Curated annotation (Swiss-Prot):
Its cofactor is Zn(2+). ATP binds at L8, S9, G10, G11, M12, D13, S14, T15, T16, A17, A18. Belongs to the QueC family. This is 7-cyano-7-deazaguanine synthase. Binds 1 zinc ion per subunit. Catalyzes the ATP-dependent conversion of 7-carboxy-7-deazaguanine (CDG) to 7-cyano-7-deazaguanine (preQ(0)). It comes from the Bacteria. One of its GO terms (biological process) is queuosine biosynthetic process. It catalyses: 7-carboxy-7-deazaguanine + NH4(+) + ATP = 7-cyano-7-deazaguanine + ADP + phosphate + H2O + H(+). It comes from Nautilia profundicola (strain ATCC BAA-1463 / DSM 18972 / AmH).
Length: 222
């Protein structure tokens, strides 16, 4: 059976990407990163819950604490507040410098070891916070780098099934593939109840509302 590494944060987008990979006939090898983010424990729980749901035993949980040493992002630096006043133009302080580049590099190492032919990542360019490492152009360049820096027989395709979808279309796609959205976690700030006001919560809530579907995770405010 063909194999695919899935970068699985436990959020709605990456989980939907995992279910798409499964529907396309891949044996899923999930990779999760603990990078000292504010919601590290809650994201890890979501990851494990989703892996349990899919009966995935071969899981990679990789600790990369150096993001906290680098700082420069509200997700890893407690001295930088997570914005709660709505999604605005420009790159927000929740951007973690080159995070997806580092994630993809590690995922490529796992893929080469496991003999996987694809890496799935749930990046979204169209309806998102505007991170530069979530664009289709960036992913295409990373794929070139991965295949030029691995063994000649290694040929990995980086798949981004959601990159051009709006959030409401991602919600609808998730429902189509029977994704357990109630197990996913998107909030940047909280680990008990989603805050409802950070960029990630706002984008998620907007997506559910426009899709006409109820979001069953607990929110502090909506």
């Amino acid at each position: 059976m063909k194999k695919a590494v899935v970068i699985l944060s436990g959020g709605m987008d990456s989980t939907t990407a995992a279910f798409i990979a499964k529907s396309e006939g891949y044996e899923i090898i999930p990779v999760h990163f603990n990078y000292s983010q504010r919601t590290e424990k809650r994201e890890l729980k979501a990851f494990n819950d989703i892996c349990d749901y899919l009966n995935l035993d071969n899981r990679y949980i990789i600790d990369i604490p150096f993001f906290k040493q680098i700082g420069a992002s509200a997700l890893v630096d407690e001295n930088i507040d997570v914005p709660v006043d709505g999604v605005k133009p420009g790159i927000p302080v929740t951007y973690v410098p080159f995070r997806n580049g580092i994630f993809l590099s590690i995922a490529a190492a796992v893929a080469e070891k496991e003999g996987a032919e694809a890496i799935y990542i749930g990046v979204v360019e169209e309806d998102s916070s505007g991170y530069p490492d979530c664009t289709e152009d960036f992913i295409q360049n990373m794929q070139k780098a991965v295949n030029s820096g691995t063994k000649p027989e290694t040929n990995i395709e980086i798949k981004t099934p959601l990159v051009h979808l709006k959030k409401e279309d991602i919600v609808k796609t998730a429902v189509k593939y029977n994704v357990p959205l109630h197990l996913t976690w998107s909030c940047y700030k909280n680990e008990d109840e989603a805050c409802g006001v950070c960029d990630s919560c706002r984008l998620r809530l907007k997506g559910f509302e426009k899709a006409g579907i109820e979001d069953r995770i607990p929110y502090k405010q909506k």
